[in-house]
């Protein structure tokens, strides 16, 4: 039986974010996801989940400054420490909210950085995130995003995913 989660970043946008939890429950959803929880405390969000009988399904690792067009940090060699701090923050939220998966946005390929450096950074960051999340009982998930919706997005097709070294390879 398929299960659907309401994406509160995309649905019920006529309401304030915290009011969207009730709107999702009223529409019959049992689970929710959204881009980022970090503008609110985990306690505020947990209260909305509990009050509305909802399960937190997924959210993203911090992805840089979304308002300025950033769409992830995983492929940025000059932002590794920020990426790692984001993994720690996401785990702290997930431990309160109860979700068992977190999505990592690869990011827009940085200009002026060679392919090998970008790929090595990306794979090392994925390995770091996968190891930390697994230790916390959380699954790391990824999504490809086409370059029409996000020009320059690094992980933009499955061919790249299959030809890149696995984060689990030694």
Give names to the regions the model predicted.
Residues 36, 146, 169:
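Short, glycine/acidic-enriched loop or turn micro-motifs at the edges of active sites
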Residues 74-85, 113-124, 152-160:
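Alpha-helix N-cap and loop-to-helix initiation/capping positions
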Residues 12-13, 109-111, 147-154:
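Short, small-residue-enriched loops and turns at beta-alpha junctions
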Residues 38-39, 63, 108-109, 147-148:
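Conserved beta-strand edge residues that scaffold enzyme active sites
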Residues 94-113, 142-147:
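Active-site groove signature of glycoside hydrolases
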Residues 162-170:
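Single conserved hydrophobic/aromatic residue that forms the stacking wall/gate
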Residues 1-99, 127, 134:
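N-terminal pre-domain/capping segments
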Residues 31, 141-142:
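Generic enzyme active-site microenvironment
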């Amino acid at each position: 039986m398929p299960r659907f989660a309401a994406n509160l970043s995309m649905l019920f946008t006529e309401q304030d974010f915290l009011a969207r939890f009730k709107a999702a429950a009223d529409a019959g959803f049992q689970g929710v996801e959204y881009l980022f929880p970090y503008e609110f405390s985990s306690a505020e969000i947990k209260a909305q989940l509990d009050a509305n009988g909802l399960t937190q399904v997924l959210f993203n690792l911090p992805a840089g400054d979304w308002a300025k067009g950033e769409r992830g940090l995983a492929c940025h060699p000059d932002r590794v420490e920020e990426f790692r701090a984001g993994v720690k923050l996401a785990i702290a939220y997930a431990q309160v909210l109860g979700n068992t998966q977190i999505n990592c946005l690869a990011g827009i390929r940085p200009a002026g950085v060679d392919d090998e450096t970008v790929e090595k950074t990306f794979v090392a960051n994925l390995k770091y995130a996968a190891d930390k999340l697994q230790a916390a009982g959380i699954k790391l998930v990824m999504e490809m995003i086409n370059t029409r919706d996000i020009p320059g997005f690094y992980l933009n097709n499955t061919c790249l995913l299959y030809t890149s070294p696995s984060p689990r390879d030694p």
